[in-house]
């Protein structure tokens, strides 16, 4: 579905942006394809940094998805106040970003997705639960720090956690939670081999709500490498998941 910004001359430019939210000027970083066409509705991915961080930890690579998207996607990295996300104020903040951006840029409002790391991952699942009719999918890397709302509804969901993290070693509570919401069969999933990774799809999920889990032998990071490899395997896994929508 085309947003109100389709057909308009854009005023928002790449780089730092601001929006008034809750009476405060809030910041985010925007990246639009170089050959942007104001009549073409783009996928939008919102990328959330971890605790104590800011959008510079995410932009300009957006967890490695920018290069993989090949001009198909607009990316936004919001900034948390003081580096920490709030389940209340920041849901409204992201609402306000979306209102501003969809009014100015040509967005496919049926293909808005979330990705976040650590507390930013928790912010992604909070938004997926709070606004299930807005977000098509959510990807959570090592998410923690915010409570899951009780009002969660089905949403396509992917998560990952390292075996060497606190609460790791096969801890699938995030993915199991959303698997339950999505009507999937909660089952024993593949474990990563030493120095490697293993990704698994839950079975029996409701139509349009695939649920995927990635286990890896590593620590607290959104971009783990397999042993002996210089490049992370995670961006390709995430892009394969999100680009199906």
Region roles according to the model:
Residues 1-44, 88-89, 115-139, 143-145, ...:
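A domain-start/cap signature at the N-terminus of enzymes
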Residues 164-168, 220-222:
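Acidic catalytic loop of the alpha/beta-hydrolase fold
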Residues 5-7, 15-113, 126, 130, ...:
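Serine-hydrolase catalytic machinery in alpha/beta-hydrolase-like enzymes
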Residues 56-67, 96-97, 141-150, 193-203:
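Alpha-helical scaffolding within the catalytic cores
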Residues 82, 193-199, 213, 217-222:
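Histidine-bearing beta->alpha loop at or near hydrolase active sites
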Residues 75-77, 210-215:
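Conserved beta-strand scaffold positions in the cores of enzyme catalytic domains, especially
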């Amino acid at each position: 579905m085309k947003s109100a910004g389709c057909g308009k001359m854009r005023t928002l430019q790449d780089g730092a942006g601001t929006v008034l939210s809750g009476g405060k000027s809030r910041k985010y970083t925007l990246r639009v394809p170089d050959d942007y066409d104001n009549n073409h509705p783009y996928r939008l991915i919102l990328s959330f940094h971890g605790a104590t961080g800011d959008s510079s930890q995410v932009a300009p690579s957006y967890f490695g998805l920018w290069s993989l998207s090949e001009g198909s996607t607009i990316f936004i990295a919001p900034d948390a106040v003081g580096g920490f996300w709030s389940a209340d104020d920041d849901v409204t903040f992201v609402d306000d970003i979306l209102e501003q951006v969809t009014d100015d840029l040509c967005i496919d409002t049926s293909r808005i997705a979330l990705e976040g790391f650590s507390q930013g991952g928790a912010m992604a699942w909070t938004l997926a639960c709070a606004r299930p009719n807005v977000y098509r999918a959510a990807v959570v890397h090592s998410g923690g720090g915010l409570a899951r709302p009780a009002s969660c509804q089905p949403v396509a969901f992917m998560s990952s956690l390292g075996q060497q993290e606190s609460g790791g070693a096969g801890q699938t509570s995030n993915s199991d939670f959303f698997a339950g919401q999505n009507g999937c069969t909660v089952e024993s999933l593949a474990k990563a081999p030493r120095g490697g990774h293993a990704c698994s799809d839950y079975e029996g999920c409701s139509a349009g709500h695939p649920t995927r889990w990635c286990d890896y032998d590593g620590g607290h990071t959104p971009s783990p490498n397999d042993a002996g490899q210089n490049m992370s395997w995670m961006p390709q896994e995430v892009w394969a998941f999100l680009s199906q929508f």
